[in-house]
Design a protein with these regions (language model features):
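Residues forming the flavin
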Residues: 1-182
Length: 182
């Protein structure tokens, strides 16, 4: 999706984190970065759930890039910004630092094209009510989380999984990291 795999300037958040860690991306060399949320997530046919960590990861990376390079322009295309707990403060800080948030809906997803070594992201900006075009040095995609534990170990340890293959939590609000088995 969104040209992933066709250009080295289109990466996932996991790849961005690795590139920042091993210094293969220098934030000071970037002028414009676009981040797109809910890539292949919250769709009718695939990953029809919110992974609950993508927005936090996006905000963390956007703030890191902005602190490393205050002159960088960052746009975040999002469907719904889902931050939990203290991470909500990251959202507030990001807006205060000048990071631009552009909401999109399922029917009007951003479009991505490649031009030379840049990425062109077009979308509809609901506040101004018009299409926009952004020429970016880097496009970062927030992809959903997939369950990775095979069913056999879950059965062996007696841990229940939900219909999607994730461990079933004891109580999503108060005990989200506790399994049903005590």
């Amino acid at each position: 999706a969104y040209g992933y795999g066709k250009s080295p300037v289109i990466v996932t958040h996991k790849e961005l984190e690795e590139d920042l860690k091993n210094k293969s991306i220098d934030p000071s060399s970037l002028k414009v970065v676009v981040m797109i949320q809910c890539v292949d997530s919250r769709e009718k046919d695939q990953k029809n759930y919110c992974s609950r960590i993508c927005c936090s990861s996006t905000l963390k990376h956007a703030l890191h890039l902005k602190s490393s390079n205050p002159d960088i322009t960052i746009y975040i295309f999002y469907r719904d910004m889902m931050t939990y707990g203290f991470i909500e403060t990251y959202y507030t800080k990001a807006r205060q630092k000048g990071i631009t948030f552009i909401q999109y809906d399922f029917e009007n997803k951003p479009d991505v094209t490649l031009e030379d070594s840049n990425v062109i992201v077009t979308g509809f900006e609901p506040i101004i009510g018009a299409p926009i075009e952004i020429k970016a040095d880097l496009l970062v995609l927030a992809t959903g989380v997939l369950p990775s534990l095979p069913k056999d170990p879950a059965d062996y340890f007696g841990i229940q999984t939900d219909g999607l293959g994730f461990f079933e939590e004891a109580e999503s609000k108060w005990r989200p990291v506790d399994a049903l088995k005590e």
